[in-house]
A protein has these predicted regions:
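Surface-exposed loop/turn elements that mediate protein-protein interactions on large endomembrane-trafficking
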Residues: 1, 25-50, 72-94, 117-138, ...
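Repeated scaffold domains used in trafficking and secretory/extracellular systems
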Residues: 1-6, 44-64, 92-106, 138-150, ...
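A generic structural signal for ordered secondary structure
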Residues: 5-6, 10-12, 125-127
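Short beta-strand elements that form the blades of beta-propeller/WD-repeat-like
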Residues: 8-21, 58-71, 75-77, 102-117, ...
Length: 177
């Protein structure tokens, strides 16, 4: 996967490769806005030991100075404020099976299996620094999951649930077609 920063000067990529018959992952940060000191424009490389041997299936710039990597073992947030040296800000391990991910400029969200209690799913929202905004369980058969402004949307073909950033359900309704 790859993601271009909003101003188009930075690129983050996730590469999968084989090493002695074992599939591994590396994350590479490029900056095309800097001088030609490094003709490859590589400003940072993170190997599997930095990511706990996780496979990074999705990488995204949230804004000019924040990026997120979604792995099969959780997510990791990076700061690119120092253009020549991206740094890991926070690694958030997730033990449960990750069902869905979403991201916006200010927030990152995950839906996971809920292993405690009666509801089958857990909704976890984080800010771009990796702080938990809210974490709640739910029982709703969704097909889509988005963050729009200060709202979290879960929806399917015939209904929708909307939560605010305190985790309060603001809307729960069906559509008549």
């Amino acid at each position: 996967d790859m993601s271009l920063s909003p101003n188009g000067t930075q690129l983050i990529t996730s590469y999968m490769y084989l090493d002695q018959g074992i599939i591994k992952c590396k994350i590479v940060f490029y900056n095309f806005g800097l001088g030609k000191n490094d003709p490859r424009r590589v400003v940072g490389i993170f190997f599997p030991q930095d990511l706990g041997d996780a496979m990074a299936g999705r990488v995204r710039f949230l804004d000019e100075s924040h990026a997120v990597i979604f792995t099969d073992k959780g997510m990791q947030l990076f700061s690119t404020r120092v253009e020549t040296s991206p740094e890991s800000v926070k690694q958030i391990p997730i033990e449960e099976n990750i069902r869905s991910i979403t991201y916006a400029q200010e927030y990152v969200g995950l839906v996971t299996d809920n292993v405690e209690g009666g509801d089958p799913y857990s909704l976890k929202i984080f800010d771009k620094e990796g702080n938990t905004v809210f974490d709640r369980t739910f029982n709703y058969q969704y097909t889509g999951f988005d963050i729009d402004g200060g709202l979290v949307l879960l929806y399917n073909d015939s209904s929708c649930k909307v939560y605010n950033m305190t985790g309060t359900e603001k809307y729960n309704g069906t559509f008549d077609f």
